[in-house]
């Protein structure tokens, strides 16, 4: 077994146990310290709360690390299809450990946080990352896809606000909702164009052919599955954002009428 393979397996295992520790111990202690409302939540709410705390931690780690790699790791950018061992592989190993950890938690607490779409998302991602790490290919693409995680903290924060019963149209929720919509669109929807554009640009080239049919199909299918879910979530998020903006406009119009200043 090569040292690089041992390193990636070690990173995946450390990632798994770290996120398990965060879920079962650290999140309970930390959440009770920073949010007094946490202790008043039901058992089911606490389970999902802890799951989302872990999700946020993972997203910040792999998202920021992934952005650094995308911008500055020349080894990864030099050969997007067949680039050798790089920081991108480490980032993918961290993400893999998290996905395995989260899958185990979802299955264990299925009646509380079970969601078939998350199972599909995690399985599709894990399969793709397994091929990347096993075959040493497409690390650049895998890392690029991880940039989508930068939207998760905003999605989770929205849930935290709701769990703590913040007013639906409070300033904090409105600002977070707008940021969530914008960031989600940039990293999960707008990013599709350069991704599939790159896929088209390398189609039929010698490096692409060397990938083999299995990896070629897996690359396309796993990305399409994930992107279909991203589009579905984007539609749902957009509807919520439009509803909030419409409410704000109605409130402004109402206030203008009350003040005798109809614009």
UniProtKB/Swiss-Prot annotation:
Concerning InterPro entries, the annotation shows: TLC-dom (IPR006634), TLCD (IPR050846)
What are the BP-aspect GO terms?
lipid homeostasis
Pfam families named among the record's database cross-references: TRAM_LAG1_CLN8 (PF03798)
On whether Membrane is a keyword of this UniProt record, the answer is yes
Cell compartment(s), UniProt: Membrane
Q: Does the keyword Metal-binding apply?
A: no
Bilayer topology term: Multi-pass membrane protein
- Domain TLC, residue spans: 44-246
User: Which sequence ranges are marked TM in the entry?
Assistant: 7-27, 53-73, 90-110, 124-144, 173-193, 211-231
Tell me which domain of life the UniProt entry assigns to the organism this sequence originates from.
Eukaryota
Cited SMART domains? TLC
The record's comment on protein family reads: Belongs to the TLCD4 family.
Q: What protein does this entry describe?
A: TLC domain-containing protein 4
Naturally occurring in which organism (per UniProt): Homo sapiens (Human)
Q: What is the lineage of its organism?
A: Eukaryota, Metazoa, Chordata, Craniata, Vertebrata
């Amino acid at each position: 077994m090569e040292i690089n393979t041992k390193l990636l397996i070690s990173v995946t295992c450390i990632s798994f146990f770290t996120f398990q520790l965060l879920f079962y111990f650290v999140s309970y202690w930390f959440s009770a310290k920073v949010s007094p409302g946490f202790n008043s939540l039901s058992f089911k709410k606490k389970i999902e709360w802890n799951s989302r705390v872990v999700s946020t931690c993972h997203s910040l780690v792999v998202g920021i690390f992934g952005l650094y790699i995308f911008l500055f790791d020349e080894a990864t950018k030099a050969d997007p299809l067949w680039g050798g061992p790089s920081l991108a592989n480490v980032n993918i190993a961290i993400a893999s450990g998290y996905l395995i950890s989260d899958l185990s938690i979802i299955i264990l607490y299925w009646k509380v946080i079970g969601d078939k779409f998350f199972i599909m998302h995690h399985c599709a991602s894990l399969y793709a990352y397994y091929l990347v790490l096993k075959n040493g290919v497409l690390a650049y693409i895998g890392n690029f896809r991880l940039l989508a995680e930068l939207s998760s903290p905003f999605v989770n924060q929205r849930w935290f606000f709701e769990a703590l019963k913040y007013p639906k149209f409070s300033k904090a929720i409105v600002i977070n909702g707008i940021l969530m919509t914008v960031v989600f669109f940039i990293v999960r929807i707008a990013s599709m164009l350069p991704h599939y554009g790159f896929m088209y640009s390398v189609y039929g080239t010698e490096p692409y052919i060397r990938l083999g049919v299995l990896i070629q199909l897996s690359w396309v299918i796993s990305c399409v599955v994930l992107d279909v879910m991203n589009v579905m979530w984007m539609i749902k998020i957009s509807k919520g954002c439009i509803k909030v903006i419409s409410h704000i406009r109605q409130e402004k119009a109402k206030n203008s009428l009350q003040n005798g200043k109809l614009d």
